[in-house]
Amino acid sequence: SGQNNRINTHENIGWYNYSGTFKLSDKFGLHTEYQWRRDNFITEWQQSLLRVGVNYQLNPRVLIRAGYALIETFPYGEIPINGLGRDFTEHRLFQMVQLSHKEGIVDFSHRFMLEQRFVGRYSSASVEKEDEFPLLNRMRYMVRLQVPLKGKEVKDKTPYIALYDEIFVGFGENVNANIFDQNRIGVLLGY
């Protein structure tokens, strides 16, 4: 019984993201983020994610963050993530540690995150709104490399390129078949 009942699909998802950090003092800050995720790149809803957190800069190379996210997921694609083809809400608590270092002109970061996900589900097809929110635990690890496209370091308004790989692993009682949840690989341009 080494087989897995996982279904793989390919979707054209557009992710549009706002991220802001507001420094409150030398050590504390506020992280804000909104992700507008669309199916068929932009034409249909896929997901809305609002995340806020409190940052604590332990030292120049170690950032700690704890926070909350509110996620609304809509049915999309050939096989909706929710078996009833309905939207659902997720309430998520998270804790994060990010370690940073520099080698030459390359900025490296390693992000370790724990998430406690309370994912809405319907106990039966007859209920109109999610009535159960079981706890799903997830660990995330991301490595990111960032290189300035001009100059020797990334400052405000410096163009840069970044590469990242993030692995998601579920654990605990309600995980079922999705222990290895996701692997996100990306290339970013920014300034």
Located regions from the model:
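Transmembrane beta-strands of outer-membrane beta-barrel pores
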Residues: 34-40, 68-74, 101-103, 114-118, ...
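Short loop/turn motifs that connect adjacent beta-strands in outer-membrane beta-barrel proteins
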Residues: 26-27, 61, 102-109, 149-159
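Transmembrane beta-strands of outer-membrane beta-barrel proteins
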Residues: 30-32, 64-66, 106-112, 139, ...
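Start-of-domain marker
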Residues: 3-67, 71-74
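Residues that define the transmembrane beta-barrel architecture of outer-membrane proteins
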Residues: 10-14, 46-48, 89-93, 133-141, ...
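Extracellular loop and loop/strand-boundary signature of outer-membrane beta-barrel proteins
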Residues: 4-6, 36-40, 80-84, 126-133, ...
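Residues on the lipid-exposed face of transmembrane beta-strands in outer-membrane beta-barrel proteins
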Residues: 18-22, 52-56, 95-101, 114, ...
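Hydrophobic, well-structured mid-protein blocks that either form specific transmembrane helices
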Residues: 81-139
